Structures are given as structure tokens and as C-alpha cells.
Amino acid sequence: MRLAIDTATSRLSVALGRSSTGAIHEAVDGARQHAAALLPAIDRLLSRAGVSRDAITSVVIADGPGSFTGLRVGVAVGKALVVASGVEFWTVPSLLTRAIVGSAPGRITVGLSDALRGQCYAGAWLWLPGGIETILPPEARTPASLRAALPRPDAVIGELPASTAAMFAGWAPYLDLAHHVDARWMLDLVDRPGGAHRVADPLAWEPDYGRPAEAQALWEARHGRALPHPSRGGG
């Protein structure tokens, strides 16, 4: 069974299963709850499935961009599970788990999340019969620059404050900017070329925080080293 973990936003989402179909899921709202809630949520999923942690064959982590503190919670737990059990370690762009909701062959879909400061984290993907092609890699953008870079996508899925969401009115035929993250979709991306990425060295891997944050600066000062910028193509 695959265990999917998304702690990139204020909603903690975990799922257990082979694919989104038939998977079991738990969500906990509140960014400050992630550290205390993640392991109990995983244990509840295992209990509901009637299995132990030995049944987990791979761990799939949402790798950002998103909250520095939230991402580190998911990364720490995911790495610990992988190192302890030797199972596969996969990563998925957090925005891709939103964009898949509007996917269909030939469609370009956009995943969005709030980046504060009048910006949003955005990424765009083209869905092909044989895989997924990145059109715009995930990064922080202003609504105006995003609309200029991609004039007419087919679907836009994300979660934004009302003031930011209003700037995307009429941008796409399908627009859902009140979509809660759901880790079940991450399970499907492991089987899609261009979706999830298998990491060969989990201990050396770091997620995509999107941009430096105060929490990141404090972490680097405490540990005496800079966090590397992740490469989705390596590792």
C-alpha cells in the first residue's frame, strides 16, 4: 500500500491505498496542528485498513511549494518511515495534486495555492494519454504575470483568499479556487510518467519551499548550513 502525505498548506492530508479509488483518507485543518496530528492520523488510517506499518510499500510526499514549517513536518515523518523500513520514496509537486482534479487528455490545468504578499504559487501541466508535461514549473507569481504567461488554460484548481481568487475570474472554463487539498490524488501520480518522482537518496533530498521564509532562515542559522534548492529531475 502507498502512504501519501501532504503538509504543504494549512490542511494536513494523508491517504492510504494503491490509487485514489478505494483509498482511505484523513484531513486535519490548522497549520499549527501538523506536528502533533500527522503520526496519529497515519496510525488511524492503518487501523481502519486493518494493517500495520509493514504493509506500507512506498511513501509519497507533497514536496511544495508551500509552508516551510508544514513541509518540514511531512518531510521528517516521511524520511523516518522510509529509512526505518527501506520502502520506496516518491515526491509530487503540491500544486500537481490540485491540477490533477481537472485533468483530461489534451487539457492544460493549473494548480494554485496562496503565497501571501499578493502572490500565489502556481504550476501548469498538459495532460497527455501517455503522461504529464510541465508547462509552467511551480513558483510564486502575481496573478497578472500568471495570466500573461498562460492566457487560457482549460481548468484552474486551488485554494486562495477571496481577494486573490477574484483576480482569476473568467480565466478558464473550469475554475475552482475553494478546493481543499486531498492526498488521495497523489497515489495516482506515482503511475503517471511526468507525475511523481522517485528519490534515490531520501536523506539528501529537500522539498521546494517556494521562497525563503523566516522559519527557513532560523533553521539554517540553527543548523549552520543552507538548505539546498531541490532539483525535481535528480535525486
Task: Spell out what each predicted region is.
Residues 42, 78, 161:
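Generic structural marker for isolated residues within well-ordered, non-membrane alpha-helices
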Residues 60-89:
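DPxDG-like acidic metal-binding loop motif
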